[in-house]
Amino acid sequence: MPEPDARLTAWVHGHVQGVGFRWWTRCRALELGLTGYAANQPDGRVLVVAQGPRPAGEKLLELLRGGTTWPSRPGRVDKVVADWSAPQERFEGFVER
């Protein structure tokens, strides 16, 4: 029986604005079949909200934290703070906000 969908909420700290990080995150999330968004925050972080199968969310989190990818992750990630919950709303696709 497949696992229920999960919601990953991740706050990405570092030099992650103005470097293509949200675009890169969107591409990886779509490749993994996730829905949600990546949004710049006023304090310089990027907020990533991704919903879908938990294993896909775990893979995205690994990539956000520095897992090997091609193309390589833009910017510099110092820390990722993540939280898991049940999906709270329905998203169409994955967008940059």
UniProtKB/Swiss-Prot annotation:
Residues 7-97 form the Acylphosphatase-like domain. One of its GO terms (molecular function) is acylphosphatase activity. The active site is at R22, N40. The keyword Hydrolase applies. It catalyses: an acyl phosphate + H2O = a carboxylate + phosphate + H(+). Gene3D superfamilies: 3.30.70.100. Keywords: Hydrolase. Signal peptide: none annotated. Its EC number is 3.6.1.7. Belongs to the acylphosphatase family. NCBIfam families: PRK14422.1 (NF010997). This is Acylphosphatase. It comes from Mycolicibacterium paratuberculosis (strain ATCC BAA-968 / K-10) (Mycobacterium paratuberculosis). The lineage of its organism: Bacteria, Bacillati, Actinomycetota, Actinomycetes, Mycobacteriales.
